[in-house]
Amino acid sequence: MMPLAVLQVKRLQPKLITPAKLTPQETKFLSDIDDQEFLRFQVPIIMCYKDNPSLNKNLNPVKVIREALSRALVYYYPLARRLREGPNRKLMVDCNGEGILFIEASADVTLEQLGDKMLPPCPLLEEFLFNFPGSGGIIGCPLVLVQMMTCLTCGGFILALRLNHTMCDAAGLLLFLTAIAEMARGAHAPSILPVWERELLFAPDPPRITCAHHEYEDVIGHSDGSYASSNQSNMVQRSFYFGAKEMRVLRKQIPPHLTSTCSTFDLITACLWKYRTLALNINPKEAVRVSCIVNARGKHNNVRLPLGYYGNAFAFPAAISKAEPLCKNPLGYALELVKKAKATMNEEYLRSVADLLVLRGRPQYSSTGSYLIVSDNTRAGFGDVNFGWGQPVFAGPAKALDLISFYVQHKNNTEDGILVPMCLPSSAMERFQQELERITREPKEDICNNLRSTSQ
């Protein structure tokens, strides 16, 4: 594995990639879900590909993907534009053809040498995704930045991008990446045509809040535990792996009526919420929350949106508890609260969020240390994006974002599992890791039984 100091990346001057054809010059409003304060940040994504001569016929991946990007922008032309604010800070896109920022780079390294440094929290993110001056803002800046780094000694490449989250959620970004990939493989148009129609998620006039939204409520007199005395320099990131063994041990800690009805995501979320709260040493009487980002698309949540809709279409309903019962009760207590919160998500809930954002002047989610937000990216589909070199060896968010953790699919040795990056103050991180190791440790008698069953 390569030491961090050894990697040297050579970058060419950034270029603006514009749509391959003329596109409409117009102004487009974002939806009230897109427009919330919570989404005014840029999210980094990394996609790593091995060389595959049998598929790519020795083509130059930078040239192929850059040209495909330009052609895909004919359909996704708002992504090549810039945001501005209107009255009451309402976001809108000025469709004036400025382009996406594209950086070509190279490094004398192999993907094998990089090893787990490609995984979140990616310690080489600044090398894979250069923060070009003037590109990191929300207003008047490129909505997408792409850096392609070719790994000269192995023929593979790393595509890293940074997306202004007000424009797309994970499902919307996947539609865009899939369109680029299809065109890189020779398609003349995306198989799913993009749909803007952000007015579908505008609040009605007059807006009316019909659901409880704990995720936007402020907690009076919160303490934050060890979060309160921490600054950004004291925050550390670390990833935690949940494989078959960890899930087997956790499932033995929940009551039978929950074993068959809870998902892996539910169980991991309950576990993180409980033991993160313990690690932060939060006041026992304080309310603590965890929000699960829930996609509104699909039959389950019954939100009627076109197939090609690529705007933000999710909510993050919050489970809430006092810290003391959360920490003292068995894991099933947290699990039931997580399941109950997720079950509130439907079309009425999403539209009630839009109404709340308009009525209350676009409130920020609670940003205290007693709050955790989790997003399941294991089924987002980033691992299926094929530009002509096969599927990526890794694809997904590059790191956690303060209070937000992304769950990503990861193969550890021979098994598929879930990797969860977490951001915490350094002292709390040590306690959190110790707690996780303790509660996912398999009892000795179970280890012996598993060895006997394996040898039979």
Swiss-Prot record:
Alphabetized InterPro entries for the sequence: CAT-like_dom_sf (IPR023213), Plant_acyltransferase (IPR050898)
Active-site residues annotated for this sequence: 165 (proton acceptor), 386 (proton acceptor)
GO biological process: alcohol metabolic process; fruit ripening, climacteric
Database matches in Pfam families: Transferase (PF02458)
Tissues of expression: Expressed at very low levels in the skin of ripe fruit.
Keyword terms, alphabetized: Transferase
GO molecular function, one term: acyltransferase activity
Other comment: The fruit of cv. Royal Gala exhibits a high ester accumulation, whereas the cv. Granny Smith contains low ester levels; this influences strongly the ripe apple fruit aroma.
Family: Belongs to the plant acyltransferase family.
Protein's job: Involved in the biosynthesis of volatile esters which confer ripe apple fruit flavor. Alcohol acyl transferase that can use a wide range of alcohols as substrate to produce esters.
Record's protein name: Alcohol acyl transferase 1 allele GSc
Lineage: Eukaryota, Viridiplantae, Streptophyta, Embryophyta, Tracheophyta
Gene (name only): AAT1-GSC
